[in-house]
Amino acid sequence: MNIDFSIVIPTLNSEKYLKETIRSIISQDKSINIQLIFSDGGSKDQTLEIIKSINEKNCLKEIIYNQIGLTKALNEGFKKAKGKYLTYLNSDDMLSKNALINIKNNFEQKKNNEWIIGFCENVGDKYFLNNLVNFYKKNLLKFINFNLLSINNVISQPSVFWKKSFFHKVGEFDENIKFNMDYDMWLRMIKVSKPDVIDNNISFFRRHNKSLSHNNLISQFKEKYKIMRIHNKNLVISTIHLLLSAFIVFIYKITNY
């Protein structure tokens, strides 16, 4: 079977949302051949049973057993990738309907594209704030460039896809980074090739109080600033980044977002 997409999904006691994540993938267009690579950190719940129950003709599944951290888990997963196009999802993310066929068609129609970004919809119980973030990111994403990305990461990880050959060119995820390995990767990618932004909702990001992005908020933003400074030495950009980050942290804290 010729694999179109390899999707890495790190898991750890992920039974609550994993079925929905998997369903959103296997319900894609049946002409798409998918490799699902689960990198499990030692789940004690029903996570592995859920994974083993996948039985789709167009879906190849693999499980990597590890307790080595998220970034290492991603790299180990992508070493197993057989598809032309790569991405990764958290175990509570979801793809939108027709996401993969839209991405595949874009890559095939625009041969020079190295990576593609679509829109992502934040979902959860904070309806107003989710809609505000969705509006903010969607409109800024249309103007994405290196400096804008340096000011703030407006790219939503579940809606990013790249060619396997491009991944080899830019290198694997930095295993010294705990929270923002995706932000570092996007900055490295955009310095090599500008992404194509497509006007489609590609994924859903589930925001809840147990998600990594909800917890460790201050540590996450401190790390993000350090990453940005490695890639962009411009003091004006750095200052704007800091001010915007402080404002975002303030809003997130007072609203418990």
Where are the predicted features?
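Cell-envelope/extracellular polymer assembly enzymes that use nucleotide-activated donors
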Residues: I3-S6, Q35, D184
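Glycine-rich, basic loop-to-helix element that forms the pyrophosphate-binding segment
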Residues: Y65-A81
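Conserved donor NDP-sugar-binding/catalytic core segment of glycosyltransferases
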Residues: N98-N131
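Short beta-strand/loop segment that forms part of the nucleotide-sugar
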Residues: N33-G42, I63-N66
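Short, well-formed alpha-helical segments that are part of the catalytic scaffolds
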Residues: S14-S27
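Short aromatic/hydrophobic "clamp" motif used to bind/position activated sugar donors
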Residues: L86
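A conserved acidic beta->alpha catalytic loop
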Residues: D40-E49, N90
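Conserved nucleotide-sugar donor-binding catalytic segment
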Residues: Y136-I218, E223
